[in-house]
C-alpha cells in the first residue's frame, strides 16, 4: 500500500509533534486536522487504485487513525479512552463518526479539564465525534436500559489512557453479570431490525448501511453471536450450527461488496453518504463495472441478488436463534 503518508504517521513522530504543541490548543487542532486529512487522502488513493482488498483498506485506515487519538491525548491515569461502534470494530469508513467512550471509576475522575480540552481538540476533525462519559456503575445502568449503548460496547476496543476501565468492561461483557440475558438482547435486536426495515424500506435509492439486506443485517447477526460467544465467536457459532460454512462465506462476500460501495460513495461525495442516490449509482456502477469488465447491468444484478441472499440468511439464522431460546420465530 502507498506509504508516503503512513510512514510519517508513526506514533513516535506524532508524539513529538503534539507534545511540542500541547500548550497551544489552536496549534494542536490544526495539526491533528491536517494529519487526518493526509491519511484520508492517502487511503482514498489506495482504494481507488483497486490494488488492495477492502478489508486491508479499512484495517489500515483505522490503524493510522488510532495514533492521532493517542498522541493528541494527555496522560490519563484514571480514564480509559475506548473506541466503540464501527470504530471499535475497525470498520470505520472515511467520514464516518468516531465514537468514543470515556470510562472511569467515578464521576469525580471524569470532571477533568484535560479531558474537556482533549474532546475539544478531537472536535476539530472534519468528522463527527460521538462520545459518552460513564463511571463503572452508570455504564451498567445505562447499558441495561439502552440497547444501542449495549450494542456499541460489544465492539469496544482500548485506545489509550488507563486500562482499568477496559479490563472492567471486558469482564462484565464476558460474564454478563448485571447485563440483560441473551433472551432479552435477542428480542431487542429483532425489534430494532423490524423498526429499521420500516424506516428504510426497499426503494430505488437504497441505503447501503440501513436498507433491508444491507450492512446492518450483517451487523445484527454479528452482534447477536458476539453477545452469545464473546470469545472465539466464529468457531463457536459454526460448531453450534447456528450458521453453516457456505452461509458464512456468502455473508463475508456480501460484507466486502457493501463496504466497497460505501467506501466509494464517501470518496465520491466527500462526506458521509450511505444512500445510493441516482448520480451516485451511476458513478458506482461505472467504477466497479470498468474494473471487472462486466456490463453495467451485471453489477446491479449482483448487488440486488446479494441483498436478497443476506436477507434470507439473516432470517434463517434469527429463526434458529429464536428456537434456541424458546421463542417463536420473529
Predicted segments with their positions:
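Conserved catalytic core of two-metal-ion nucleotidyltransferases
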Residues: 63-66, 70, 112-167, 188, ...
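Extended catalytic-interface subdomain
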Residues: 163-180
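Helix-loop-helix transmembrane hairpins and adjacent membrane-interface loops
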Residues: 74, 106-108, 116, 170-173, ...
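N-terminal regions immediately upstream of nucleotidyltransferase
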Residues: 1-77, 95, 199
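Active-site nucleotide-donor binding segment shared across nucleotidyl transfer reactions
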Residues: 56, 65-112
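Glycine-rich, histidine-containing beta strand-loop boundary motifs that form or position
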Residues: 83-85, 96, 102-105, 126, ...
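Conserved nucleotidyltransferase catalytic core and NTase-mimicking acidic/glycine-rich helix/loop elements
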Residues: 2-3, 178-325
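A glycine-rich phosphate-binding loop feature that marks nucleotide/adenosyl-phosphate handling sites
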Residues: 133-142, 278-283, 327-330
Amino acid at each position: 500500500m502507498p506509504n508516503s503518508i503512513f510512514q510519517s504517521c508513526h506514533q513516535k513522530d506524532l508524539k513529538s509533534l503534539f507534545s511540542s504543541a500541547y500548550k497551544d490548543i489552536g496549534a494542536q487542532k490544526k495539526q491533528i486536522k491536517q494529519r487526518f486529512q493526509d491519511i484520508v487522502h492517502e487511503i482514498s488513493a489506495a482504494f481507488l487504485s483497486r490494488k488492495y482488498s477492502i478489508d486491508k483498506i479499512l484495517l489500515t485506515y483505522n490503524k493510522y487513525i488510532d495514533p492521532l487519538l493517542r498522541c493528541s491525548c494527555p496522560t490519563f491515569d484514571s480514564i480509559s479512552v475506548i473506541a466503540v461502534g464501527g470504530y471499535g470494530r475497525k470498520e470505520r469508513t472515511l467520514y464516518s463518526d468516531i465514537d468514543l467512550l470515556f470510562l472511569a471509576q467515578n464521576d469525580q475522575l471524569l470532571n477533568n479539564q484535560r479531558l474537556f480540552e482533549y474532546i475539544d481538540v478531537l472536535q476539530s476533525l472534519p468528522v463527527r465525534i460521538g462520545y459518552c462519559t460513564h463511571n463503572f456503575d452508570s455504564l451498567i445502568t445505562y447499558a441495561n436500559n439502552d440497547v444501542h449503548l449495549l450494542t456499541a460496547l460489544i465492539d469496544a476496543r482500548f485506545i489509550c489512557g488507563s486500562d482499568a476501565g477496559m479490563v472492567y468492561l471486558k469482564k462484565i461483557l464476558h460474564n454478563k453479570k448485571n447485563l440483560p440475558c441473551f433472551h432479552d438482547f435477542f428480542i431487542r435486536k429483532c425489534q430494532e431490525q423490524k423498526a429499521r426495515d420500516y424506516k428504510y424500506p426497499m426503494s430505488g435509492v437504497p441505503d447501503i448501511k440501513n436498507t433491508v439486506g444491507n450492512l446492518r443485517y450483517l451487523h445484527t447477526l454479528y452482534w447477536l453471536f458476539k453477545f452469545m460467544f464473546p470469545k472465539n465467536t466464529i468457531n463457536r457459532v459454526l460448531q453450534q450450527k447456528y450458521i453453516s460454512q457456505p452461509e458464512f462465506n456468502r455473508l463475508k462476500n456480501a460484507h466486502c461488496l457493501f463496504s466497497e460501495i460505501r467506501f466509494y460513495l464517501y470518496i465520491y461525495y466527500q462526506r458521509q453518504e450511505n444512500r445510493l442516490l441516482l448520480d451516485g449509482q451511476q458513478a458506482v456502477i461505472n467504477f466497479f463495472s470498468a474494473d471487472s469488465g462486466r456490463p453495467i447491468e451485471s453489477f446491479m444484478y449482483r448487488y440486488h441478488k446479494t441483498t436478497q441472499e443476506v436477507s434470507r440468511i439473516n432470517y434463517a439464522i434469527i429463526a434458529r436463534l429464536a428456537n434456541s431460546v424458546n421463542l417463536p420465530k420473529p
